[in-house]
Structures are given as structure tokens and as C-alpha cells.
Amino acid sequence: MIKQALISVSDKTGVLDFARALSAMGVNILSTGGTAKLLAENGISVTEVADYTGFPEMLDGRVKTLHPKVHGGILARRDFPEHVAALSKHDIPTIDMVVVNLYPFQQTVARAECSLEDAIENIDIGGPAMLRSSAKNHKDVIVICDPSDYSLVLHELNTNNGEATYETKFALAKKVFAHTAQYDGAITNYFTSLGADKQHATRSSYPATLNLHFEKVQEMRYGENPHQSAAFYRESNPQAGALANYAQLQGKELSYNNIADADAAWECVKTFDEAACVIIKHANPCGVAVGITPFEAYSKALQTDPTSAFGGIIAFNREVDGNAAEAVAKQFVEVLIAPSFTEQAKKIFAAKQNVRLLEIPLGDAVNSHDFKRVGGGLLVQSPDAKNVTLAELKVVSKKQPTPQQLQDLMFAWRVAKFVKSNAIVFCANGMTMGVGAGQMSRIDSARIAAIKAQNAGLSLVGTAVASDAFFPFRDGLDVVVEAGATSVIHPGGSMRDQEVIDAADEHGIVMLLTGTRHFRH
């Protein structure tokens, strides 16, 4: 049965109710600084750590709990007679519970105006020491670093004669070690990102050492293939709009490939202002469209490649209503993603329980970095978040684009960014007409896109074409024009740009350069 608890928290969420409940159980509460003041002001009996140790807080609060009477009471093993004798000799009572969360270092350094001095003053010293001491001796000490665990611990204390089960103590200890590791990793990332100048005014996006912290969401039946094991991890606090914030409304457990494809679909559909639908297969868009309603967007997107859409991942950037749900329900779909679903839509999909429905609130989340594992290393880059504006486009052909062509070209360019390289995308009237993806030569991607359109019964006459990178020769351009394209958008930057521009003029088509490449591997 716990007799004494030490509470010292930066995040004071729920701490009053928790401390009040402990006090009602007869637990003596030790505390420091602002936490002690808050408890006392709210009528909760509390002993200041300085009074308990007989040693005052000093150095502007830098030294509060770093004292043998604190750490001895935490670290002593109750089943070791030598430890018990040492406590008795030095008049050190045991501390049976430690409730600590740390100075907000990560939030502090995330501020643009944060100085090195600000960062240093938000490095917690005593807190991690107490947490680690308690977690090390978790057999005898209940340690809490997360306010969300208060209710669990109180429930166990109330049902187990003032004690927590070993299973709970061990789980809380694991959580503490993960928490302190993340905290120290954040400090390391910050310090190793600072420049060598005296004022440390420059800060690199790529620290000398990189510490990553992700929390396991689930283990999966298998990975990309059945012989591979896999798990899904998420950041501690994903940004609004990130896939990791999904809520699954129904359907089987998400697979490795489901999550990878769902992310590709969601990232693409979020880039559109109009109601949009994206259909993904093997991480490539096989149909993308915008419309007045989700139903219209889906109907148009499906036309691009209905064969490949079978068993695909579908994402909307608007609430899915009954009309859209009825249309999608006619198709075999693995995962359906949207900001929300109407009750009618939910009812329709309830009859198809294998369909995984994911709700994700819309947001502008962009990963701070993208990662790619290589043998013995990790490639790290900023995300491809560049969106070209009309003002940045350069018309290099003699023929000027019409407003409709500009609209089609911008749509095609937006889609091409999410197609595996080499990427060629034919578009018209707010929908993809043919998608060529992942070929080693650009000319083959162009041919495949044209074949896809032909197989779907779609005419490419008058279409706009986007290429994720420049045309190295005119042959790729000749193929898309032969298929029916009358306008083309690509980054430019080839040694043979002028040759390709001359070919565009020869064909009498519109050509725009973006100056931005969108390789995707």
C-alpha cells in the first residue's frame, strides 16, 4: 500500500483531482515549486520537498529534488534487507509513487524566436532523474509521466487495497523510458543542429545525429508480402490532416499495403480545393477527378481506368454522402477515406463490412522530413510540398494557352506529382484521361498512358499532358501529340529544351515550363 507520493508536474492537467484522491486515501504528498503551490491553494495537504529534505531549492530552481532523501526513497529495493537498513540508518522514508512530467523542451524549441538560453532553461534535469529512478525500481514504485494514466492508477488503487498490479507498474515504467528517451533525443537533435557561430543563430534542418521517436499502433499480419513481418508506428503528436490521425469506422484491420496506398491517396486528394476523388492502386493514381459533388468526382475518376480501380484505395476531400456511397459500393474497394461520412453513407457500407472506412479530419499537415532506408543508412529530405502557381508558369511556345487549357494543365501537373516516375498524365475537364507511371523511359510512360485511355474508351484529342520531369528528346512529345494532346506542361531544364520547344511549335501546341521537377520513387 502506497504511503508517500512525490508529485512535480509541468503539465498540470488533472493533477488536482488525482492528488485530492490520493490525499483522501491517506497518502502523504511531497511536491515542489508551482505544483506544491497549486495543491496548497486548492486545500490539498502537501509537504514541500525542501522541507522534507531539509535542503532548500537553489540556483533558481535548478536543484530541487537531486537529494539522497528523494532518490534513496525511490531506488531502495524493499525486498533487500541491506537497502531497508540503509534507509533506516539515514532516516529516509520510502517514496512509493512518483508523478512527474517534464519541462516543455520540444514546444519551446519549436518556436521561431527561441534562443539558446530559452532552450537551456527548458532542459529538465531533476524530472528525468526521478522518472528513471522510479522506472528502474518499478517493482516497488508506481511511476506516472502521462496525465492520461491517472484514472487507470486510481482505479487499481481503489480495487487492490491501495496498490497497483505489477503488470501496470511495468507498463508505466516502459512508458517512462520511452518518454525520457524521446526527451533526450529531442535535446540532442536541437543541440547538434546549431551552427558553430557564437550566437548559434543558424540552425540546420539536419542535425549531426538524428533521433526519431514513433509509437507502435499495431502489428500487422504481414508486410508488403506474406513472408515479411510488419508494424505501423506513428509520431507522438501527428499534425492535423496526417493519415496517422485516422479513425477506422468499420472493416478489417488495415494491412501494410493498405496504409501505404491510403497515404498516397490522402496526400493527393488534400491538394485540391474543389470536391475531388483519388483512386490509388499500388501507390499510383489510376483515376483522379474533381466535380461539383463527391459523386461526380468519383464517377469521373473511375472512368480513367476502371480495371485498375478494382480493389483500389479511394479518397475524397469532402464528406461522402449517400449518392457517392451507393456508387462506390458497386465497386470492390479495399479502403475508403474521407473527412466524414453521412449516416446514410455509413448505413450503405454497413452491408459491406469488409470495406475499411477511415475518417481523417482535413488539414495542411506536411511531414517535416521524408525518410528512405538504404543499406546501413537513412536518406532524409524535406517533403515535396512545392505547388506551382500560375504566376510561376512560363509559356515557351508560340501558341498561347486558353483559360481552359491553363486549368487542365494545372490539374494535370498537380496529379503528376503523385505518380511514380517517369510520369506522364493526360487530363481534360477536371479528370485524368490516361496515366503512365513508373517506366524507365519517358516515351514508354507516354505510350502506356495513351494505351490506358484507349482501353477505357476515352479520347485524348484536345487533352493536356503533364510530365514530372523534362523531355530529354522530342520523341516523348511526339508520342503525346500523336495521341491527341494540344498542350503540355513540364519542368524544363534539359540541354535539349529548345529542340523540344521547337517541336511543340512545329506541332502547333501549347507548352509551359514550371521550373520544378517532381520525381517520385
Curated annotation (Swiss-Prot):
Q: What is any one GO biological process for this UniProt entry?
A: 'de novo' IMP biosynthetic process
Q: What EC number(s) does its UniProt record assign? A: 2.1.2.3, 3.5.4.10
* Catalyzed reaction equations: (6R)-10-formyltetrahydrofolate + 5-amino-1-(5-phospho-beta-D-ribosyl)imidazole-4-carboxamide = 5-formamido-1-(5-phospho-D-ribosyl)imidazole-4-carboxamide + (6S)-5,6,7,8-tetrahydrofolate; IMP + H2O = 5-formamido-1-(5-phospho-D-ribosyl)imidazole-4-carboxamide
Show the GO cellular component annotation of the record. Answer: cytosol
Q: Which domain of life is it from?
A: Bacteria
Give the GO molecular function terms. IMP cyclohydrolase activity; phosphoribosylaminoimidazolecarboxamide formyltransferase activity
* This protein's pathway: Purine metabolism; IMP biosynthesis via de novo pathway; 5-formamido-1-(5-phospho-D-ribosyl)imidazole-4-carboxamide from 5-amino-1-(5-phospho-D-ribosyl)imidazole-4-carboxamide (10-formyl THF route): step 1/1; Purine metabolism; IMP biosynthesis via de novo pathway; IMP from 5-formamido-1-(5-phospho-D-ribosyl)imidazole-4-carboxamide: step 1/1
Domain annotation MGS-like: ranges: 1-145
Q: Does the keyword Signal apply?
A: no
Q: Identify the SUPFAM superfamilies for this entry.
A: Cytidine deaminase-like (SSF53927), Methylglyoxal synthase-like (SSF52335)
One Pfam family named in its UniProt record: AICARFT_IMPCHas
User: What's in the keyword line of the UniProt record?
Assistant: Hydrolase, Multifunctional enzyme, Purine biosynthesis, Transferase
Comment block on domains: The IMP cyclohydrolase activity resides in the N-terminal region.
Q: Which family does the entry's similarity section mention? A: Belongs to the PurH family.
Query: What is the name of this protein?
Result: Bifunctional purine biosynthesis protein PurH
